[in-house]
Amino acid sequence: MRIALAQILSGTEPSANLRLVADYARRAADEGAKLVVFPEATMCRFGVPLAAIAEPITGPWADGVRGIAAQAGITVAAGMFVPAADGRVTNTVIATGPGVDTHYDKIHLYDAFGFTESRIVVPGQEPVVIDLDGVGVGLTTCYDIRFPELYTELARRGAKLITVSASWGSGRGKLDQWTLLARARALDSTSFIAATDQAHPRGTLPGSAAPTGVGGSLVASPLGEVLASAGSDPELVVTDIAVDSVAAARDTIAVLRNRSEFAQIDEAESRG
């Protein structure tokens, strides 16, 4: 299966960001990719009031993504924000394309490193796996990557490829953590990991504590190998993954087969 990572740099205007989705999705499709993974906050970067730009999953921005995916003939996974009942939003990944139209709400909120996402975001409750040409694809978002039990649960539900849409916070050692965590989750779940971050804004947002990306998007194999990666600037990464190799990796490492049943996901709670 050929997949693509669209490492873009989102701005604050959803319509401009939608044009980026159209451009990168078309380019990914032209290179033969079946799936293109965009970052968290593709709709609008962090650091601005999100409730003001949030739209329903049936709204014009999401419909724009659906139209782009349909026209290009590719499945698109992209981060957006959806209004919640209490005035906050959900941090949502829309996944849409041929035979696919669903969404995932981020379960683990980024109440860490001095940022409190739960002030503005309501947590999701349910892991999501989509079917892409017979391949199970799990959907996750950014801070989720620090919680291995979600990834093993997605594998248990049939995922052989797990996407991570991120807007990673910058800081000392954070890029190394991002790369390490992606490879570790590949090993935990013995799945391919397609991890797409926002490109690094390179000092264009002085004084902002919001997580706005460090780049370093990558694809990791079920054995934790980095198969393809990006630098810090906007970039489209296209690579092939051998989905059939997942079974052999799971037989060899056997962490899913030998896993103790004490580790379960029962619920997700906001700490805000």
Walk through the language-model features, giving the residues of each.
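Short beta->alpha transition motifs characteristic of CBS
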Residues: C44, I94, Y104-Y110, L218, ...
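Active-site catalytic loop in hydrolytic enzyme cores
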Residues: P83-L161, S170-L180, A184, D251-V255
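Short polar catalytic/cofactor-binding loops
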Residues: Q7-E13
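A conserved C-terminal secondary-structure "cap"
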Residues: V246-G272
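Cys-nucleophile CN-hydrolase/nitrilase-fold catalytic domain and related Cys-dependent amidase chemistry
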Residues: P14, A22-H103, G169-A184, D188-S191
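CN hydrolase (nitrilase-like) catalytic-core segments centered on the catalytic cysteine
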Residues: T58-A77, I145-E235
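Short beta-strand scaffold segments in enzyme catalytic cores
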Residues: A78-M80, N91-A95, V128-I130, S217-V219, ...
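Extreme N-terminal starter segment of soluble prokaryotic enzymes
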Residues: M1-A4
